[in-house]
Design a protein with these regions (language model features):
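Short, positively charged patches
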Residues: 1-151
Length: 152
């Protein structure tokens, strides 16, 4: 069936991010707030696996912004990213990385502000749903304005 996602689950699309990059992006989505542009740029420049290794203190981070590294280390990952991916797959969700075939090309209009990755639920390919979809999203640290609008 064309336009439907297969049982890729935690692996995302058939072609795309390797396992290390996928796990690192999953881990980073747990500890970083949406819109952390410096993180997205660092992951694109250095690789998400290198950024995640630096956050865990397993590798040096000479090319990683010190303020970003400090911010990420304030939010330790309590669960391994493998568990998050397994739980998502159990709910019929999948984890889409920018390297995946399914990644919506339309996100390029965000000019460096695109998300690190996307958690998606449903069978329709994200790349095909993107042009006719609406999303309501939020962050853990909502502003007063955001809270007011969401409650209306």
């Amino acid at each position: 069936m064309t336009g439907l996602a297969g049982p890729a689950g935690p692996a995302g699309s058939a072609a795309g991010a390797d396992a290390g990059e996928r796990l690192a992006r999953a881990a980073l989505t747990r500890i970083a707030e949406p819109g952390t542009t410096a993180l997205v740029r660092a992951a694109d420049r250095l690789g998400a696996a290198a950024v995640w290794a630096a956050v865990r203190g397993e590798a040096g981070a000479p090319d990683l912004d010190a303020d970003l590294l400090e911010l990420l280390r304030k939010h330790p990952a309590e669960f391994p990213p493998e568990r998050d991916l397994e739980l998502a797959a159990g709910l019929g969700a999948r984890f889409i990385c920018p390297q995946d075939d399914e990644w919506p090309a339309g996100l390029a209009v965000l000019g460096g502000e695109e998300p690190l990755a996307l958690w998606v639920r449903g069978e329709l390919l994200l790349s095909e749903a993107f042009d006719r979809a609406v999303a309501v999203v939020g962050a853990r640290a909502a502003t007063a304005y955001g809270g007011r609008v969401a409650s209306e």
